C-alpha cells in the first residue's frame, strides 16, 4: 500500500505519460497527504488495465456501491420491471356505504406521489363508495419489518439520505426521496416576523415547530431543521434574510407506512370519502377484492433519479425487491445475497467485496478500484447497458435529470457532456467511477477512490483533473502500450 506523502509512485509507471500526469495531479494536492487513493483505468474496448495505483486495495466506495446495485437490479429484475401499489376492499357494500375495510397494499414503489394516491382514491370513488364503515389498513408486508440498513447511524435516521424503507411509502416531489417530506422555508413579510413554511405533501402526520425568524436583507441565512428521533416533530430554527431565496429541506419521517396511509386518507377526503374506523397497519386478507392497481415507471426510468441524484432509498428498495422477486423474502440479507451471486456470474469477484447495503452509506462497504472498472467493463456487453449508461450523471449538464451530481463539475472542459460517472461521498470518502471518451475517440473506464483524508477541500478537484486529462488525450491507449 502506498500513501501520498511525497514519495515517488511505482517506478514501472514513471516513464509513461499517464502515470506522470496522474502522479503530478495527486502529488500537488496537500489534501491527499496521509490519505489513500485507489485508481484504476481500463480500455473500454478490451478491458485491458492501462493504469493502476493501489487498485487492488479495498476501499470505501460510498455511493459508487450503487453501480453494483443498479447492475444487479437490471440483471435480476429486468428492464420491464415495475412496482405495483394495490387497493382492496373487503366487506358488503350497501348503496354508497362499505360495511368493511379498505386495504392499501404497497409493493415497494419508491416513487408514489400525492397525485398517485389521489388517483387511487378516485378509483375507490368510482366504486360508488363515499362512506367506509370500517378501517383503513396499510399493508407493507411485501418486505420485512427492518426499516434501516444494517450499519446506518442513529443521527442519519432523520436525514433524507437515511430515510426508513417500507413496502408502502410516499415521496414529496419528482426527485422521489421516498419516506420524506419537503419543507420550503421562505422569509416572512418583514424583519422580526416568523419565516414562512410550506410542506409537501401537506399533511398533519408531521408536526412542524417554526422558530425561524426573518432578519434584514444583509443578515445571515442560517436555517436548521431537526426531527425528534422517534416522533414526527420537526423543529425549524435560525434566521433567513428578507427577499432571500427559499430554503428547501427534505426530512425523513418516522413510520413511512403510516405516512403513506395518512396521505392516502387525505386523498380519500378530497373525493368525499369518509372512514369511520381507524387508520392502522395490517395484512390484506386473501378474500379481499382488488379494485385498483397503480404501476410505477419502469426500472430504466427509475434508475435516472436513483443514479443521477444518488437516491439512497431507491438503492435499498431495489435490494429488498431482488430478494422478494427471486427468493420470496424482501430483506436486506436475501437481496444482498442474490445480488452478490448475480454479480459473480457477471464476472466480478464478489469474494473480494464487502457489500453491506445497496446505497453505499455504510462505512463497512469495501471494494477495489479494479473491481469497479471490471464491473463497468463487463456491463457493456449486457442488453440493458444503454439504460445503465443513460442513468449515470453527465459532467457539466445543468439539467438535474441529466447532469445530476456532476452537473456543476468539469464545466467548460473536454469532459463536459463527455464524462458519465457515478459520484460518491461519505465521511472521509470521495469516489468517482465511470466512462470517458478521449479526444481521439477512445473509450476509457476509470475509477478513483479517495479515502481517509482529513479535509475535503480540493478532493473532488483531483478526480475532475484526472477525468479531464483523460478526455483531452489523443491516441492515449496506443501511447501507453
Show where each model-derived region lies.
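Conserved serine DD-peptidase/penicillin-binding transpeptidase domain
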Residues: 26-27, 81-332, 337, 341-346, ...
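Beta-lactamase-like hydrolase cores
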Residues: 2-46, 51-58, 118-127
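Short connector loops/turns at beta-strand edges and beta->alpha or beta->beta junctions
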Residues: 44-46, 239-243, 311-312, 438-441, ...
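Soluble non-cytosolic domains of exported or imported proteins
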Residues: 12-16, 20, 60-68, 77-78, ...
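N-terminal secretory targeting signals
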Residues: 1-29, 188-193, 199-202, 213, ...
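Active-site SXXK
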Residues: 47, 61-79, 136, 168, ...
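Short beta-strand scaffold segments in enzyme catalytic cores
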Residues: 39-41, 85-87, 433
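Small-residue-rich helix-loop
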Residues: 50-52, 113, 319, 323-481
